[in-house]
Amino acid sequence: MLTERQLLIFRAIIDHFTWTIQPVGSKNLLKEKGLPYSSATIRNEMGVLEEYGFIEKTHSSSGRVPSEKGYRFYVDYLLQLKKLDKSDRQMIRSFFSENYYEMEGLIQNSALMLSDLTNYTSILLGPEATKNHLSGFRFVPINNFQAMLILITDQGHVDNHLVTIPEGTTLSDIERMVNILNERLVGLSLDDLKVQIPMEVKELLGKHVRNYESFMHVFSDSFAQASQQKVYFGGKTNILNQPEFHDINKVREMLHLMEEEQDVYELFRDIPDGLQVKIGRENNNSLMEDCSIITATYNIAGERVGGIVLLGPTRMEYNRMMGLVDVMSRDLTDVLTKLYRDNQN
């Protein structure tokens, strides 16, 4: 579709805008990139690229910038993923070589590391909570009036609730209650438990635990919270530091979105397998018209459990950013699978 000369000029325009965020004309492009063509030739070829819709003129300058269509063409047909440079690879290798014993901490720290490497906003979607099954209860008395209710799932999620011990309830009552719950509820899905605790369990509690009804709302709240989808952010406001976000209303709306974790989960829950890129208006979200989103998924023991989202400007350095997300997907899968298998033993 494009000649070698047009491709070379197009790549030069993309490279210029990635690093300067400024439109470029033929004279500056020649001076900056040292292209083996005259300014007039470059100007003519830029005219062809504009006719194809790959570059466009801005209102404030006579120079040209890449268009969404141009970036799409670049990512689909011109981009070749390269190996990460030594510093990126060393940082990732060092991170994943540490010993991790808890899944949530690993996923959260992965989000933070990705944002540190990119200076963009990273979002990791946790394993689907409704598939989690209860693996245990713990009740830790703090004093005569309060205790910590700890709920643990088979996916490594830990949910803590500070609860008030009903008057007249003894530590023996609490111990019997925890034993009954662990004996009867372990292995059941949170999706079922958040709807209703089995009647047989309530009957057992009624026989052996005084004032057990006072604890029922605590259990219901705990199951409901644990069954919510988990979203982990890194550099939540990094995207707002980009020059593209100068509209205060858009900044306010984006901050509001980032605070609504369940909305963020719904926005990205159906990301496809493999490394994917959506550019600008392809995101079907007015807040993200100036953004590109790179996504991938991660697995545990061969089963897809979560997603990785990198949110940055359309002028991002696609080669490096896609490489980072790809390596993150693979390495996180390996470490989570190892952690899962270690916990099964």
Swiss-Prot record:
The keyword Translocase does not apply. The keyword tRNA processing does not apply. GO terms for biological process: negative regulation of DNA-templated transcription. GO terms for molecular function: DNA binding. Keywords: Repressor, Stress response, Transcription, Transcription regulation. It holds the Pfam family HrcA. Negative regulator of class I heat shock genes (grpE-dnaK-dnaJ and groELS operons). Prevents heat-shock induction of these operons. Belongs to the HrcA family. This is Heat-inducible transcription repressor HrcA. It comes from Listeria welshimeri serovar 6b (strain ATCC 35897 / DSM 20650 / CCUG 15529 / CIP 8149 / NCTC 11857 / SLCC 5334 / V8).
